[in-house]
Amino acid sequence: MTMPQTDGVEFASRNNLENGDGDQVRSQWVAIERSPTCKRITTALFCKRDEQGKRSQRRVMDVSKLEDLDRRLFIDELIRHVEDDNRVLLQKIRTRTDEVGIDLPKIEVRFSDLFVEAECEVVHGKPIPTLWNAIASKLSRFTFSKQEDKISILKGVSGIIRPKRMTLLLGPPGCGKTTLLLALSGRLDPSLKTRGEVSYNGHLFSEFVPEKTSSYVSQNDLHIPELSVRETLDFSGCFQGAGSRLEMMKEISRREKLKGIVPDPDIDAYMKAASIEGSKTNLQTDYILKILGLTICADTRVGDASRPGISGGQKRRLTTGEMIVGPIKTLFMDEISNGLDSSTTFQILSCLQQFARLSEGTILVSLLQPAPETFELFDDLILMGEGKIIYHGPRDFICSFFEDCGFKCPQRKSVAEFLQEVISRKDQEQYWCHRDKPYCYVSIDSFIEKFKKSDLGLQLQDELSKTYDKSQTQKDGLCIRKYSLSNWDMFKACSRREFLLMKRNSFVYVFKSGLLIFIGSIAMTVYLRTGSTRDSLHANYLLGSLFFSLIKLLADGLPELTLTVSRIAVFCKQKELYFYPAWAYAIPSAILKIPISFLESFLWTMLTYYVIGYSPEAGRFIRQVLILFALHLSCISMFRAIGAVFRDFDVATTIGSISIVLLSVFGGFIVRKPSMPSWLEWGFWLSPLSYAEIGLTSNEFFAPMWRKMTSENRTLGEQVLDARGLNFGNQSYWNAFGALIGFTLFFNTVFALALTFLKTSQRSRVIVSHDKNTQSSEKDSKIASHSKNALPFEPLTFTFQDVQYFIETPQGKKLQLLSDVTGAFKPGVLTALMGVSGAGKTTLLDVLSGRKTRGDIKGQIEVGGYVKVQDTFSRVSGYCEQFDIHSPNLTVQESLKYSAWLRLPCNISSETKSAIVNEVLETIELEEIKDSLVGVPGISGVTAEQRKRLTIAVELVSNPSIIFMDEPTTGLDARAAAIVMRAVKNIAETGRTVVCTIHQPSIDIFEAFDELILMKNGGKIIYYGPLGQHSSKVIEYFMSIPGVPKLKENSNPATWILDITSKSSEDKLGVDLAHIYEESTLFKENKMVIEQTRCTSLGSERLILSSRYAQTSWEQFKACLWKQHLSYWRNPSYNLTRIIFMCFTCMLCGILFLQKAKEINNQQDLFNVFGSMFTVVLFSGINNCSTVIFCVATERNVFYRERFSRMYNPWAYSLAQVLVEIPYSLFQSIIYVIIVYPMVGYHWSVYKVFWSFYSIFCSLLIFNYFGMLLVVVTPNVHIAFTLRSSFYAIVNLFAGYVMPKPNIPRWWIWMYYLSPTSWVLNGLLTSQYGDMEKEILAFGEKKKVSAFLEDYFGYRYDSLALVAVVLIAFPILLASLFAFFIGKLNFQKK
């Protein structure tokens, strides 16, 4: 490879300092040399530049204090053309170190006889996690009946990854590539059984810290969505530190001073800036942004599924950049090219190759579909299959090895594709080269034996048998420190990030505070001047107001739980990388929430204190603020600890709800301490709410205004406290405050310990390939024979002219993403849509298909010669999205069956639909996994490439006339991509219109297309026309442009096209390819052809469908209910946890209120019974509402996809979602009756039992449906949870428990009637005691129970019929609102 040209790059050369400003540089350098070492290594001669690129005079500067603009402009000038100038930069750095005689540290990785095994559970039948299976699995832990087996992932692999060389890791999915990368980087899951030896420079993992010596780039993109790309890289670079750069810079500086060498000022400035540790921002970040092509989105937030952000390809590059921004030189990289075009992949790997060769790096990269040019960048190659290494040696010799085995790679065939297919039983025969000998399948074990006997194999075994020569020099590259920064620097960096995340989530905190002010305003007017009357009755109301304040602030901490769980995955990744210890993450999380806790406590007290009428002394006001502040702080600490311990949304939410129940029930208000069983009194002392209750009540009732003496020779305040069991003396306030601070410290300690010691949750399961070689029969996919079930369809032409698309930027400006795009997609023609990353390919597909939910679209789009009608178009088209969105709890076959059921016309029989489903399963080679659960990406279920094939299959079964496919081969290996594209080609040959965006096509895949639309950045077309035989037409077009380099023989034309049309190539040529196309004859011909196509299409009948949906409303509902039933039944984490929670709550109430309902002698007995009802209703409802939010939110993105495809009316979906909840709520209600009814001692009669069952059943439905409604009216679960907390506060306040109906001010009585809990509690209490005529002692006077209910609570027995109607009306209303809003609102931003 020739050295690149460096014209135009303004490097100051040491050998040329005499020219220009040489004397000035020397004199300035002398000043730097006189500085102390600590200052000299951060001081350089830096040339400032302005935004126009104009340079000022060089001056001595501290490079640790460079501004953002200085760093960006410096890197822009240093690296103008990435591939060329990066080599020059690294070469100059290497020359500088060589001149002073410094050897760069290097690492050789050896592994010998490495075995990795995983334990798996053996189940009978389908291993699908249903409710029964989950219960059986839990029970098997106690019965020891669980059967386990072992799966071998790696089977005795050995090899050497050498420095200065870049090694490619190839193999089919499931062969063990990821496990090998994890094993070599020291990141294997401890639960896996490992045998064998891995060493770095002869040192075992126990002698150093492998996580800090090597980097593993995961294939899962896991980032904090609120951070920008630059902030993500800066944070990673800060914690990875400078490694050996700092010491090396000191040594270079010392030796240069001794030799009198004046270094290149730019290189010196770069090296010194890159060696700075612990800085908030770093020049290395700008360098990584440049070489990865992320400069354009550097200040864009990463985003996620619910928040706009960077593209999938950019996210993939960010994952790579996050690992290589540090000083680590041993890199293990897992499928880093997913979602990237071949040109970008080539550019990134070229830079990595230069790094390996010039900086002594050791790099092992696994790729799925490397283009020939990318393939040739590698020095060595490891080919794997079935957990074994087939070949390990120089890349140049692998073809000759397989030729010796009898297999030859054809011309114009990518070697990487050949290697992955030649080891496959299905594809091997086509490469047999000994035509004079009969072909016989050569197994992987046979290949391995032949390699071991070859010269390369013998040489490898010989090297591995020799003991590595350890020396101190070779150990310099090994890191023995876990963390790169000091404790203080780690704390500061984590605090900076936490504060930034709080700023980015400021809307949530402001919104939460706004809701708190709203609820506080309601509460203060409900309890208006309650404290102005001093008697036992009003004291009871005042206690209710204090309890409500505590419950509100307790529930206000719940959003902290969801926030903790949502960030735990990123924390675990960074902890495993030894970015920082758990305490550095935990302490800022706790400390920075203190001001928020204080603010919310102060706001609440300021609103309510004097309006309600508490003791007016200023000191008591401050003490109430302090108690509420301490409670709020302890509660958010508790929820944070729960999130860290359990880490699963459903489980953590359920545990959070259980915690609220325990804290509330043992808090001293719902159940008085004297009324608790003696053996459960410890619960009172373990509840933070108890101490808050003690603190607030002692602060209030020991005030002067409550010192009125009663007949019992006690103050009124003491009498009130004694009645509640809260009289612990005046000094108890500070004891309570201290206890709450102690709880805060305890929960934060638990939080830190959980983060430190608990295993990473939700780690992806190990996927191993099935041994297809042992199958008795081979199922060969004969694509040509798949026409037996072909269905009639209408061939359609799709034309678009002068399409433009604009979006509005945050600054209020319009940004154009598509510019005058014109083209046509014709029946039977397979069209490729190509371009560099960010060119607008996906944007164009989204605009043409009508999927954009924002922005301004201009231009003409026609289907069949008529203006596109979206309802009709959605029915006749299919869209395979880039991101594979599916229901996680269906199997692969059920996903296809569901799609066929709803999208194929209703006149097609069920047998035909099933045949089509089976045919597509066979065509896309999904038959072997048809009974596998789809699962959640990266956590469970099918692999990424199987998920991609499922996405395509789901669209194929719908028999569309037009199919849009966005990156259908992304994430697939070469063989799987070929399978998919054969199926796609076959579809196009049936006369359908097929369009695919594609990033890294092989020669075979690329030339399977008939036409090509090529785009450049800015959404402009630079070529639209036929490919021609062997891509001759498109090659001829670009070769006609002066200066375009020729295509090398047997090279991939797709890679060549992307390379010559990149931005850097355009700049070199000095042309605008879009303008050249618009001025070309081809463009004029295309315009004529498009017009002719339109005119021809106009002669056909307009496509009119009889209905908006393929199926009747009844069929839609049946299909949706079938799917929802399966999804719920197979979701034990949702249903089992809420059932367990119901059992727990009922048992707790049964124990605490044991037989309390049998004897009612005074108002307190009635209050106890009412408390048990309140506890079950409110807290079981809270848990149901919380858990259903995650369940519905998981399916919402799937719903958006299915709704766009016009699979069903939203009413059919919502009705099924509503009805599927009923059996589970029914079961929970039965649990209540079975446990609570006999334990509490309610009256046994059919009427009363039914009323209890009916009231609880309606209550559960109300909370379930309200949770579902919250999901569809909010953009994400964090907002939903914040609104949910306010809903709890309102239904608690107006339930009639803390403030009975007769005492609610008339201006708020309408809220009482709107609160569902008030009707539920009315039904429960009135049905039990509304007809009781027994006299009791109530507040010093005798009253009948029925009269007391009417006077105190406002409950009348003769109103039960109205209560029954209202109770069923609430769930119907909420379900209707859910159905309405799910059809109207769409928070998916496209």
From Swiss-Prot:
Location within or outside the cell: Membrane
Gene Ontology CC, one term: plasma membrane
Claim: Protein transport is one of the keywords in the record: no
Membrane topology summary: Multi-pass membrane protein
Start and end residues of each ABC transporter domain: 137-411, 798-1043
TM stretches of this protein: 507-527, 541-561, 594-614, 626-646, 651-671, 737-757, 1134-1154, 1173-1193, 1218-1238, 1253-1273, 1279-1299, 1307-1327, 1362-1382
Gene3D superfamilies reported for this sequence: P-loop containing nucleotide triphosphate hydrolases (3.40.50.300)
Highest taxon of source: Eukaryota
Chain residue ranges for the region called Disordered: 1-22
Molecular function (Gene Ontology), one example: ATP hydrolysis activity
Subcellular location, principal: membrane
Coiled coil segments of this chain: none
Domain ABC transmembrane type-2: 489-701, 1115-1329
Ligand binding (ATP 1): G171, P172, P173, G174, C175, G176, K177, T178
Function: May be a general defense protein.
PANTHER family: ATP-BINDING CASSETTE TRANSPORTER (PTHR19241)
Protein name: ABC transporter G family member 43
Organism: Arabidopsis thaliana (Mouse-ear cress)
